[in-house]
Amino acid sequence: MQHLEEIIANASAAIEAAESLVVLDEVRVQYLGKKGELTAQLQSLGKLPPEERREAGQEINKAKGAVQQAIAARKDALQRAELEAKLAAETIDVTLPGRRIENGGLHPVTRTVERIEQFFGELGFNTESGPEIEDAFHNFDALNIAEDHPARTDHDTFFFNPDLMLRTHTSGVQIRTMENGKPPFRFIAPGRVYRNDYDQTHTPMFHQVEGMLVDENVNFAQLKGILHDFLCNFFEEEVEVRFRPSYFPFTEPSAEVDVKGKNGKWLEVLGCGMVHPNVLRSVGIDPEKYSGFAFGMGVERLTMLRYGVNDLRAFFENDLRFLKQFK
């Protein structure tokens, strides 16, 4: 055991003398490693008489534990000293201004959708949504769109198969909402729609908001009043609005809505009309009792008019120089 005490004393001295973590690890290996001095002591127990092995093993394990504790304590002290030296070497100028956190901003299309939702929400319109992959019934048939209508061709619509396609408008949401409820209805349906078109004023994917009100004694004058108020609210000024006769399969009568620009020219902004009786019949609503109006608008077009953007494609090119203007 005298030799064991000598090993402990030497180990303690080496641990205290270690001035770095690297040197301390070398001391650990010297005494506790696979070929370390204390490990060798444990391996030599087999040479002792059986009656001495137990006591000797206890003494060696006790010594091993003491060395491990001493190494852990020295390691902690060295790490603290290293951190203190690092902090002392680093200087912080507390007079420097802080780093400015740059806030993000909503996309202009998102801003427009939120403005539309807020206006109609204040009039009691709910916001509904539906699938972007639509079937022929909800996208065409229930909306009184005939089999030979141009919208049913590959030229205008992205088909998966003859009965499944990317929706060309959010009107399918109107059908689904009426299928799942009973009149009266008052809601808008914003969302992405898809058409096979790409140029300065068209993209294959764009955003649309359609609205519908179905109740007893609904008339065109109510539709005109709501849309006039909406456009004045959206452009934040009193705008001159006109309604032109038009044609949509799902409304009768139908109209295009224009606003007069600052240059005196009329600009088309949305379409509308009274819900066609066939559309009401397709969802089990009696057109003799109920009537309704519907309207639809392209979000990007309204956004272009509001912010003076000339190219629709700019909204989807993710150019921060463009998008930062709307923060």
Curated annotation (Swiss-Prot):
Record-linked PANTHER family: PHENYLALANINE--TRNA LIGASE, MITOCHONDRIAL (PTHR11538:SF41), PHENYLALANYL-TRNA SYNTHETASE (PTHR11538)
- UniProt-listed GO biological process terms: phenylalanyl-tRNA aminoacylation
User: Quaternary state and partners of this protein?
Assistant: Tetramer of two alpha and two beta subunits.
Gene3D superfamilies the UniProt entry points to:
Bira Bifunctional Protein, Domain 2 (3.30.930.10)
Give the cofactors, semicolon-separated. Mg(2+)
Underlying gene: pheS
The cellular component terms of Gene Ontology attached to this UniProt record, alphabetical and capped at eight, are: cytoplasm
Q: What is this protein called?
A: Phenylalanine--tRNA ligase alpha subunit
- Cofactor binding comment, as recorded: Binds 2 magnesium ions per tetramer.
Q: Which InterPro entries match?
A: aa-tRNA-synth_II, aa-tRNA-synth_II/BPL/LPL, Phe-tRNA-synth_IIc_asu, Phe-tRNA_ligase_II_N, Phe_tRNA_ligase_alpha1_bac, Phenylalanyl-tRNA_Synthase, tRNA-bd_arm
Q: What EC identifiers does the entry list?
A: 6.1.1.20
* Species this protein is from: Vibrio campbellii (strain ATCC BAA-1116)
PROSITE patterns named among the record's database cross-references = AA_TRNA_LIGASE_II
- UniProt xrefs under Pfam families: Phe_tRNA-synt_N, tRNA-synt_2d
Subcellular location(s) of the protein:
Cytoplasm
Q: Name one GO molecular function term.
A: phenylalanine-tRNA ligase activity
Catalytic activity annotation? tRNA(Phe) + L-phenylalanine + ATP = L-phenylalanyl-tRNA(Phe) + AMP + diphosphate + H(+)
